[in-house]
Amino acid sequence: MIPPLSSLVRYDNPVLVSTSKDKGKGAKGTPGKKGALPPVEQKPGLTQTEDILNSILPPREWTEDGQLWVQYVSSTPATRLDVINLQEKLDQQLQQRQARETGICPIREELYAQTFDELIRQVTINCAERGLLLLRVRDEMRMTIAAYQTLYESAVAFGIRKALQTEQGKSEMESRITQLEGDVKDLERQVQEWKFKCEAIEKRESERREVEAKKHKDEVAYLENYAKQLKQQLETFLVPAKKGAPGAPAAAT
């Protein structure tokens, strides 16, 4: 027989039920369902306690070689020594399984859940009503943890989506930056080309102005020289005419 995994909850010895998957309880009666809890009726204390225990902590079942084995939770009351041993086993399991002391740790959560189940078992044997109340506390804690776990998973998924979106946006932005940098370089090249063209045009215009100025200066000099020559010719022409003009007074003898 292969024993089930060890647990901090105290169980009785395994019982062979049948060679088929028949979930009868055998000598101890039919195990209670996991859903609804049995009402607290005026029954013999041992039977009522076992029914409640089986409802709170369902029996463990496994099959080996076609044989169905069932292991029920123990209905033996716990002593002070049992509680001390439970604490020692808890500390030992936490150390052996390397449970984290802080933060989210499934191993630590599992071991503390088993410890709480064992405490519920011990309390239920002494007082069924207190056991059922602790069961409600346990279920409420589990629902709260499940809600926080769902919220945490949703937050993680949201964070991953945002990270992927940011990464995608980053890639697009980097591509856009590369494109804009290329455009800037192209514009700088065009500016440089136009700058060279402007310098060439200014140089040509400067040379043209110099040529025009020199040409204009030469023309002015030529015209001044020509006017001077004409003036001299006119003066030369007018002087003899004045000397031989009729009616001019005779020179004194």
Swiss-Prot record:
Cellular compartments per GO CC: inner dynein arm; motile cilium
A Gene Ontology BP annotation from the UniProt entry: inner dynein arm assembly
Subcellular localization(s) per the UniProt record: Cytoplasm, Cytoskeleton, Flagellum axoneme
GO molecular function terms attached to this record: dynein heavy chain binding
Principal location: cytoplasm
Keywords assigned by UniProt, alphabetized: Cell projection, Cilium, Cilium biogenesis/degradation, Coiled coil, Cytoplasm, Cytoskeleton, Dynein, Flagellum, Motor protein
Coiled-coil positions: 160-239
Region annotation (Disordered) ranges: 19-44
Function recorded in the entry: Plays a dynamic role in flagellar motility. May be necessary for stable assembly of a subset of inner dynein arms or for the binding of these arms to the outer doublet microtubules of the axoneme.
UniProt similarity note: Belongs to the inner dynein arm light chain family.
Designated name of the protein: 28 kDa inner dynein arm light chain, axonemal
Organism of derivation: Chlamydomonas reinhardtii (Chlamydomonas smithii)
